[in-house]
Curated annotation (Swiss-Prot):
Belongs to the ferredoxin--NADP reductase type 2 family. Pfam families: Pyr_redox_2. It comes from Bradyrhizobium sp. (strain ORS 278). Its EC number is 1.18.1.2. Homodimer. It catalyses: 2 reduced [2Fe-2S]-[ferredoxin] + NADP(+) + H(+) = 2 oxidized [2Fe-2S]-[ferredoxin] + NADPH. The keyword Transcription does not apply. This is Ferredoxin--NADP reductase. FAD binds at residues 17, 36, 44, 49, 89, 124, 289, 330. Its cofactor is FAD. InterPro entries: FAD/NAD-bd_sf (IPR036188), FAD/NAD-binding_dom (IPR023753), Fd--NADP_Rdtase_type_2 (IPR022890), Ferredoxin-NADP_redctase_2 (IPR050097). The keyword Oxidoreductase applies. Keywords: FAD, Flavoprotein, NADP, Oxidoreductase.
């Protein structure tokens, strides 16, 4: 076993809630390491929606998923968190009161006073559509998320699906793509009504295509798509130009090893009490989309609130002999010094 990395708090998940938890903990002189299965920070915001606008962050009228991630990273710079990316936590073992030993699939071992699970919905992967040979084009012509809009500029783009992601990217990519074709198995969409109205208006004006049916075959060479075959609900078969494809068939969410850590679960979520969002195991907290409690709303701003209250309770485990005096960043010179603004 490798030598243990010691830290006050280990945060599992480097999405927005995990990142903001670093800030709240840092204000209380609590050091944190973060582990994430993804190869970059930002969680689903950066992985699936990096250029999609977010409108419900308080005081920020609009920010993209990547923009929010970048701003959070800037905000936590004063606390110098350490990131361990591309790793999954495989085991959490209680070794003290408080105290935990955490092991990753890369063989790293951590010892900490507090564990914070901020793993979103757990590990996730997009559902692959049942199209023969689609794997050969994944990562070059077939993408399950939009990370850089510019790569779709001037391309014939086929978007498959009928939910919010499919409609949102149809509307967002329409201005820059050569041509957008939206494919859905029925003429009934699960997306926001306003988005559906906008899409139908574009179709009616001849600015994009809508096909009711399914993609049955792909054509291309060396990973580069050139065409897609569509079989309509009337059994008519049509081949259309396709240089890029975005299938949005939803995500398969897996809680993964969390289910084996001895924490009470409820429908693949972690129940918590609401004064500090502590789990059934003292010293292990769960914040963000992975937790559940009466009245839970899955919003980023709610996860931020949960992180703030979690930090107050975590302080008791990290500094059991030290009384916590609540301070405001607007008036506390000591907090401002930590933030480098005084």
């Amino acid at each position: 076993m490798s030598e243990a990395i010691k830290t006050d708090v280990l945060i599992i998940g480097a999405g927005p809630c995990g990142l903001f938890a670093v800030f709240e903990l840092g204000l209380l002189d609590i050091k944190a390491h973060l582990i994430d299965i993804l190869d970059k920070v930002g969680g689903q915001c950066a992985e699936l929606y990096p250029e999609k606008p977010i409108y419900d962050i308080p005081g920020v009228p609009m920010v993209t998923g990547q923009g929010l991630t970048d701003q959070l990273m800037e905000q936590i710079k004063p606390f110098s968190p350490t990131f361990h990316l591309g790793e999954m936590v495989s085991n959490v073992e209680k070794i003290g009161d408080p105290g935990f030993r955490v092991t990753t699939d890369a063989g790293k071992v951590f010892e900490c006073k507090v564990v914070v699970i901020a793993a979103g919905g757990g590990s996730f992967q997009p559902k692959r559509p049942p199209v023969p040979g689609i794997e050969a084009y994944e990562g070059t012509s077939v993408f399950y998320a939009v990370r850089k809009m510019e790569q779709f500029r001037g391309k014939n783009v086929v978007i498959v699906g009928g939910g919010d992601s499919a409609l949102d990217w149809t509307l967002n990519l329409h201005p820059i793509a050569k041509r957008i074709a939206l494919i859905h198995r029925r003429d009934d969409f699960r997306a926001a009504p306003h988005s559906v109205e906008q899409m139908r208006a574009l179709v009616a004006s001849g600015k994009m295509d809508l096909r009711i049916g399914q993609v049955t075959a792909l054509e291309g060479t060396n990973g580069q798509l050139s065409a897609a075959t569509i079989k309509g609900n009337d059994n008519a078969v049509e081949t259309i130009p396709c240089e890029m494809m975005l299938p949005f068939f939803g995500l398969t969410m897996k809680l993964g090893p969390v289910a084996d850590w001895g924490i009470a679960l409820e429908h693949n979520l972690i129940p918590v009490e609401t004064s500090a969002f502590e789990t059934s195991v003292p010293g292990i907290f769960a914040i963000g989309d992975i937790n559940t409690y009466p009245g839970k709303i899955k919003l980023i701003l709610c996860g931020f609130h949960e992180g703030a209250l979690m930090a107050q309770k975590a302080h008791r485990y990290v500094y059991p002999e030290k009384r916590l005096v609540f301070q405001y960043t607007t008036s506390s010179s000591s907090l401002q010094k930590k933030l480098g603004v005084n």
